[in-house]
Amino acid sequence: MKELILASASPRRKEILDSLGVLFSVKISNFDESSITEKDPVKRCILTARGKAENLFKTLPQNEGAQKLILAADTLVFAENTAFPNEKIIFGKPKNEKEAEMMLKSHSGSLHFVVSAICLLDCKTGQINEKHSVSKVFFKKLSDKEISAYLKTDEWKDAAGAYKIQGKASFFIEKIEGSYTGIVGLPVRELYEILNKTEFRIL
């Protein structure tokens, strides 16, 4: 059977695969995400996941990769831009607490979207399979006190959109529409569909 390599340092993605009983190893991709200049958030997310997979593939010794599948993923948070309807506001990972505060204030009392893309690369054939999910997240109106308290948890660090839905940010979520695991960082239905096209089985 093929061996699965997760090209991600994300503990959330590792936790999801572990919870599904999937056997995998981890190798970190050094792909430069800033090299993707695509403005559309969905296309950008797909291209970033693909870039991560292809970057790791190039680093594997030729005789090592024949029976391996590389799984890469990317997650972006975005919102509609009322001033410029044809553009989207993309929320990456905040660089500092001030940036995280601005993102949380933007989410407060409003709707935003979370796109997660996955890319599966067969190291033997070079074949790529890709899927993505787009989910809606509705935040309650946040008080300054709530934002301040959440920032002190440090959950905003290394989190697209400055929050982790599986943590204390769940207190702020009124509802979601779409894939919960996609919002966390790895949409499992899409993962199941992609892996079913290969010799790798998770069910």
Curated annotation (Swiss-Prot):
GO CC aspect terms: cytoplasm
Catalyzed chemical reaction(s): dTTP + H2O = dTMP + diphosphate + H(+); UTP + H2O = UMP + diphosphate + H(+)
Cofactor (UniProt): a divalent metal cation
Pfam families cross-referenced by the UniProt entry: Maf
A GO molecular-function descriptor: UTP diphosphatase activity
InterPro entries linked to this entry: ITPase-like_fam, Maf-like
Enzyme Commission identifier(s): 3.6.1.9
Subcellular location: Cytoplasm
A biological process from GO: nucleotide metabolic process
Family matches, as CDD domains: Maf (cd00555)
Keywords of the record: Cytoplasm, Hydrolase, Nucleotide metabolism
Its biological purpose: Nucleoside triphosphate pyrophosphatase that hydrolyzes dTTP and UTP. May have a dual role in cell division arrest and in preventing the incorporation of modified nucleotides into cellular nucleic acids.
NCBIfam families: maf
Family, similarity comment: Belongs to the Maf family. YhdE subfamily.
Protein's name in the database: dTTP/UTP pyrophosphatase
Organism classification: Bacteria, Pseudomonadati, Spirochaetota, Spirochaetia, Spirochaetales
